[in-house]
């Protein structure tokens, strides 16, 4: 059965399907929208008591519901200076060292950090010998993405690609999954070196948004797009630890890359398959150089 599910993903018109679902999710269809939201809440056992708007009818579209805000203070941010926090609610897929430019995906599968970053050679060099973490956001999860530490945006790259599902089953069977799918790479300068936040698209993920540029995907065409940003002066974009940096419409995966020696140890309990809650301790950082 697993092989059949994977084979179907290769056969499906994933981009067409994603565009169609995106239009439906953006539709403001009144009682139909509310009914769809109620079904989704029941199907995935979503705790709406955490949402800023807990009533399904408060959302005009399914996208509004899916990117819902949480109540203030429901995810307190660990403010310890040398603590990096979880950027999302989800589950750790994998984490560990970046060795010779290779990142572990699942048993028997690695992929290239260079490919993940859109073949940006200088960017990949900055993370050689560092660490990575991959976090999967299930349909039930809160889908806004926050900063794990304070950082100033220096570069953003849009990389076109496939739209395979990014669930654990697909990660085990599709080689180079996260470096094959459509993605947005945001690089920040921090006190602990560069930080890459890679927002990976997936089947029926209608779009990826950032707080500084709005909707990024999908643009017209199949080429890589790169934007560079000033890191000093009035136009610099600096986000504090815990600030929202982006969101998924219909969920996906975040891959984080850290510079060599930035991380001392991952926090207690942070390991593959561990549940994550945005704002809780993710890693202990070394002192800034």
UniProtKB/Swiss-Prot annotation:
Entry's localization field? Cell membrane
Molecular function (Gene Ontology), one example: phosphatidylserine decarboxylase activity
Q: Could you tell me which InterPro entries the record lists for this protein?
A: PS_Dcarbxylase (IPR003817), PSD-B (IPR033177), PSD_type1_pro (IPR033178)
The EC number(s) attached to this protein equal: 4.1.1.65
Tell me which residues bear Pyruvic acid (Ser). 252
Q: What is its main location?
A: membrane
**A Gene Ontology biological process term:** phosphatidylethanolamine biosynthetic process
The catalytic residues are 89 (charge relay system), 146 (charge relay system), 252 (charge relay system), 252 (schiff-base intermediate with substrate)
Q: What is this protein called?
A: Phosphatidylserine decarboxylase proenzyme
Question: Which organism does this sequence originate in?
Answer: Shewanella putrefaciens (strain CN-32 / ATCC BAA-453)
Encoding gene, per UniProt annotation: psd
